[in-house]
Amino acid sequence: MKKKKMISISLLLTFSLAIALLIVFISILQPEHLHVMEYYDVRVVNGFTDNSSLPLVIWCASKDSDLGGRALQERDDFSWQLSTNFWSATHFSCTIKWDQKRKSFDAFKAPRDAYRCSPLRRCSWLVKEDGFYFSNDDVHWRKDFSW
């Protein structure tokens, strides 16, 4: 009987500790830091302006979803919607090829883009001759990196 009572007390203490830790964890996390199951629009635009007859070839995928490839003519775009997973580890990468140039980049990476794509939850990329530009409103573009 004494052993049974000790096990019950031990389980009760373990359960109480788990609840206390859960309360502490929830109180530390601010709602603005939670980006679980949020939806984002991601867009990649062919921003070449030299009237090239060569398309911008793009292929995008995550570890769970292959979006396939597209051949984008000037001003064409490739867009998709995604939702972040529970661990905020959602990650889509794209490989872009134009003429002899080839570049892989992170089109969406949850830890980086949860804030960067706010407040509209829009992550847009404009691919130009001199590099890759990012915008979260499709108006203000900032060069993120070169080819």
Residues of each region from the PLM?
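Intrinsically disordered, low-complexity segments enriched in small/polar residues
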Residues: 2-87, 95-147
